[in-house]
Curated annotation (Swiss-Prot):
Function as written in the Swiss-Prot or TrEMBL entry: Alanine racemase; part of the gene cluster that mediates the biosynthesis of the unguisins, gamma-aminobutyric acid (GABA)-containing fungal cyclic heptapeptides with the amino acid sequence cyclo-(D-Ala1-D-Val2-L-Phe3-D-Val4-D-Ala5-D-Trp6-GABA7) for unguisin A and cyclo-(D-Ala1-D-Val2-L-Leu3-D-Val4-D-Ala5-D-Trp6-GABA7) for unguisin B. Within the pathway, the alanine racemase ungC catalyzes the interconversion of L-alanine and D-alanine, providing the D-alanine which is accepted by the first adenylation domain of the nonribosomal peptide synthetase (NRPS) ungA.
Domain of life: Eukaryota
Pathway: Secondary metabolite biosynthesis
Protein's organism: Aspergillus violaceofuscus (strain CBS 115571)
Positions of region (Disordered): 187-206
Disruption phenotype: Impairs the production of unguisin A and B which could be restored in the presence of D-Ala.
InterPro entries: Cys/Met-Metab_PyrdxlP-dep_enz, PyrdxlP-dep_Trfase, PyrdxlP-dep_Trfase_major, PyrdxlP-dep_Trfase_small, Trans-sulfuration_enzymes
Cofactor: pyridoxal 5'-phosphate
Protein name (database record): Alanine racemase ungC
Length: 586
């Protein structure tokens, strides 16, 4: 490493990357403060869904001043969020209003407004209630949409922006700031009343730059290699792949498309990523949780589905959501059983494969839709946000889902981000194979420390060590050297993330503070990243979550020997605390 991670302070990004997703949260105390909402205000940079990038803040301030000057409607206490699509902006407006009116029925609709912000030669406000061609982002003259809201709704606006992930990227903000410097905007106009009251779900906007088609083809190609032989008879094609500006944006839009197909309370099995859970809880009829994902809980789920069937409930469950494996405890639920339940009761199964990546696991044998954070392993260099949704061509509901997704899709992936993603992902297979091998080596060498009574390490979590190992291995991609194209594919593995639990928080804090790697919210990068996950998310006392001492470790491209030495040095520091306290393993 050119720069020692320990030399970076709170909120400092990975050196040399203007759009880095790796932003340092260096100590255990900083992680706790972040989870309590006390650290973000001190951070000039942060993970894009947690801390607004400085260029986005600068652009937002300029646009807010323009709105105030032009319309005299923006109160001094007003704030705004920026989106690249009108549908996302209107979804944000409706969400903020719903939250505000839930607290005070006297809140008027016009207290939250959407403005069109043009860069380039044209500033005409278009009526978005009708179909129109829109290629500004590809011509270099983008149109943004600003949602203006009162300060009283700041928490609601932040929740929408953080969970649903459709806000503009830092690259798009930089592009707009350059246009501003050239005198090409911004020009501000309010949306027509018809557009402001229209449904957020409308016609699709075209992705005309060839990089989008290339990315879809590449992802579809990786999805061809199934977990079983022979290869799938109905292969994934580029139109089955939908791209988004982030993984959470993909999850949000898939959820909305499913609810348009069947509105009802969703279900999740196994531990679910916190923002995903919040989307299911707050952007629809709600969710039933089976957070442990055990056989007993799946029995309960089966009984619930049967009860709904017998009662003829008009709000039948639309989908079961899960991860493979779950973040951060690396468990895998019985996906074959979920598939059987879905077939029996005509449900969808949606699986997030971000932790394993579709280089390692094939989920199209069990899922109707696979969602992924492309910001992680597919990109691999932690400098671009993106997400995808893959529709299973063998799903009985494929035609309906494809029509719904295509009709409502709105491109939120800026072309410069797409170009970066395409370049980054060229070495995805080889990079993932290397990370798999390094991680398996680290886990094998650390495993015996769990049984050492003098070591405070109490549990090592990794798909190959979990009781659910068989469920994960059942989804691993076929690696036979005799299968077509096998020589160009990586050997599937167990992924690049493992987690460690300790005897107590004092030992965990000592380990974390002495661990010389990058520390922050992301994973799946070319450098190792550690996170005090439960502390960072502020979920210490929530049922069904991970242990409060858990530290998630994402392996990068550094040599295994170097990383093992760093981990062992940190374990020695934790061991000193453990022995000084006279602690014992639980």
């Amino acid at each position: 490493m050119k720069t020692r991670p320990q030399a970076l302070g709170l909120g400092e990004p990975y050196p040399g990357r203007a759009h880095s997703l790796v932003v340092q949260i260096p100590t255990w105390a900083d992680m706790v403060a972040f989870g309590q909402g006390k650290a973000a205000a001190q951070m000039n940079h942060g993970y894009p869904r947690s801390v607004v990038h400085p260029d986005i803040r600068s652009l937002g301030s300029t646009i807010l001043a323009k709105i105030h000057h032009k319309t005299a409607e923006a109160a001094p206490s007003s704030s705004l969020l920026l989106f690249s699509g009108v549908k996302a902006a209107l979804c944000c407006k409706h969400y903020i209003l719903r939250c505000m009116q839930g607290r005070d029925q006297g809140v008027l609709e016009d207290c939250v407004r959407v403005y069109e912000v043009s860069f380039g030669s044209s500033c005409m406000c278009r009526d978005h209630h009708h179909h129109h061609h829109h290629d500004d982002a590809h011509s270099g003259s983008p149109t943004l949409y600003a949602v203006l809201y009162p300060s009283a709704a700041a928490a609601d606006a932040h929740a929408f922006w953080q969970r649903t992930g459709p806000g503009i990227s830092s690259r798009l903000a930089q592009h707009c700031l350059r246009l501003q410097q050239q005198g090409s905007g911004p020009r501000v106009g309010a949306l027509p009343a018809a557009a402001s009251t229209a449904s957020p779900m409308g016609s699709s906007l075209p992705d005309s730059h060839p990089v989008y088609a290339e990315l879809r083809r590449r992802i579809a190609g990786y999805a061809q290699h199934s977990a079983d032989e022979p290869p799938m008879t109905q292969p994934v094609t580029a139109p089955d792949v939908f791209l988004y500006g982030s993984g959470m944006a993909a999850i949000y839009h898939v959820h909305q498309a499913i609810l348009a197909w069947r509105s009802g309370m969703s279900v999740h099995a196994g531990l679910l990523y916190e923002p995903t859970l919040r989307i299911l809880q707050t952007h629809g009829p709600g969710v039933r949780s089976y957070s442990l994902g055990t056989a007993a809980e799946l029995d309960e789920l089966a009984a619930h589905l049967e009860q709904e069937r017998v009662s003829g409930s008009p709000c039948a469950v639309p989908a079961i959501w899960c991860e493979c494996p779950s973040n951060p405890i690396l468990q895998t639920v019985d996906l074959q059983r979920l598939r059987a339940l879905a077939d029996q009761h005509d449900l969808l199964v949606v699986v997030d494969d971000s932790v394993a990546s579709f280089a390692n696991v094939d989920l199209l044998g069990v899922a109707d839709i696979v969602v992924s954070s492309l910001s992680k392993y597919f990109s691999g260099y932690a400098d671009v946000m993106a997400g995808s949704a893959i529709l299973n061509p063998r799903s009985r509901h494929h035609a309906t889902l494809l029509n719904q997704m295509a009709r409502t899709h709105e491109n939120s992936l800026f072309v410069d981000d797409a170009l970066r993603l395409e370049r980054n992902s060229r070495d995805f297979p080889a990079r993932m194979a290397r990370i798999n091998a390094t991680t398996e080596s680290l886990v094998q060498q650390l495993g015996p420390r769990v049984a050492d009574p003098k070591c405070p390490l109490t549990r090592l979590l990794y798909p190959s060590r979990c009781t659910s190992r068989g469920y994960y291995e059942g989804q691993m991609r076929w690696s036979s050297s005799s299968s077509p194209g096998a020589e160009s594919r990586p050997r599937p593995g167990y992924g690049g993330v493992f987690s460690m639990e300790f005897a107590d928080c004092g030992c965990a804090a000592a380990f974390f503070d002495h661990l010389e790697v990058y520390k922050g919210l992301s994973f799946g990068a070319d450098v190792c990243i550690a996170a005090a996950y439960v502390q960072m998310t502020g979920r210490q006392n929530a049922p069904g979550t991970a242990h409060e001492t858990l530290i998630r470790f994402s392996v990068g491209l550094e040599p295994a020997e170097e990383m093992l030495l760093r981990v062992e040095t940190a374990l020695e520091a934790a061991g000193r605390v453990f022995l000084a306290q006279g602690s014992r393993k639980p």
